[in-house]
Amino acid sequence: MVDPLDIRAMKFARTEFERRGFDISRVAITSNRGVIHVTGIIPLPQAMADDTYKHEMEVIKQVLRVKTSTKQVILETHRL
């Protein structure tokens, strides 16, 4: 049976990426036992510099850890 906390964490992760303007159509977000995995390709928005991209990813990781009470957030993404 799927843990409701994992479902809530996945939905929150999708919402957080979309809220910050990232296209996550080629990204798989999964959550299992308090660990969120984000894998895939994230196109770099045109107005975003490389340093800003890295900063936004770190902010998203921190927000996901705090708001969803996850143990770890693993980002295995590539930029276009």
Segments (PLM) and residue ranges:
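N-terminal targeting leaders
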Residues: M1-L80
